[in-house]
């Protein structure tokens, strides 16, 4: 999914650990043991747009930022082989999905490496605000001054070239005086914010629009029609399954119950899971969040629960993905 997408939908059988495999695909790198704490330089943290922009000013050293520091997975070749075997009908590991504990033991960063990262953060004035059981991510917060010192960079403020706002970004790639390899640091910039790709267009009310034959009022389409179009004749309803949705906005529960009533669908239990503080005020993109929930119910009317993982925009994607994998609820 593109960086501009507002959400990700993950649907998978209860108890399986496919979400950890998703993280594997996103974060696989071969760990290289190093001796002394030589300075390592990371890559991919400076937005390309800053190459042609001049900083408006430097961020205040007293301002706080939340960061998610990611460690690489281990045994990359073994993980690739295991992924292939899981989807190979001829393999003895076909559909033999790993538990969270198994995945962490075989491929997750080691406990000593995770503790070394925690010690590095605390030594450099950063506060650990969340740890993850799979040890893939460490969430920290700190002042801009401490972040600049820890990662040997300057946090600058720029005028966004396409949006009516400013954004912050580092002036150089972060580097760390740390012996263990680090994969990525999320949260150093807010140049690209997740947003929906839909575009609202005004309707010319003087023109008589004749909708196609949907099952809704006046022939309008409902989610049920997509189920009939894409999986006609299926008896599968997702009975007893749970679904996890990744969202950067909230929704109004009354919108969902109204849709269920009007579409003749059952009332599905919704469980909100706040990440990085969650959504305190429902925003302008609530319609897309509601649409995702309604589409899941329409396509899988027997679904037992929908877990809605909500995080403020912006928040590190990896925070939500790691939480979903570690919860292992859907």
Placement of each model-derived feature along the sequence:
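Sec/Tat signal peptide C-region and signal peptidase I cleavage site
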Residues: 32-36
